[in-house]
A protein has these predicted regions:
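Peripheral interaction segments used for macromolecular assembly
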Residues: 1-120
Length: 120
């Protein structure tokens, strides 16, 4: 389980932009589970960001067959992206993804306050 006391990883957005993350990239957890494929980013207003409350700036929407719908991974929890293998790894196990409730749409997205950014 990810706790408020766990260190917050660095935001992966600069790395993802540099490596040009593509739509339908395969997404895996640290324990090797196939989470799904990438769809788009959603950005939160900078004024509303508070990592201690788990209110992150950018989320990556992943279409997951394993979890039965969309999963919203905070960009801080992207571990690595290998464009040659078309593979992105999330810095969490499948159990941690489930425990963190990332399979629930964040409130700011549900209310239409998120800014979507389609992946190429």
């Amino acid at each position: 389980m990810l706790r408020k006391t766990d260190p917050v990883p660095d935001d992966a957005m600069p790395m993802l932009r540099e490596k040009e993350l593509k739509k339908y990239t395969d997404v895996f957890t640290t324990d090797g589970e196939d989470l799904g494929v990438t769809l788009r980013y959603f950005h939160r207003s900078p004024e509303e960001v508070d990592p201690e409350l788990r209110l992150y700036r950018t989320y990556l929407e992943v279409q997951s067959v394993e979890l039965g719908g969309s999963v919203f991974i905070p960009s801080e929890f992207v571990d690595d992206y290998d464009p040659a293998r078309n593979r992105l790894v999330v810095a969490a196990s499948l159990r941690q993804v489930e425990d963190a409730l990332w399979n629930r749409q964040p409130d700011f997205i549900a209310r239409g306050w998120g800014v979507p950014e389609e992946l190429p």
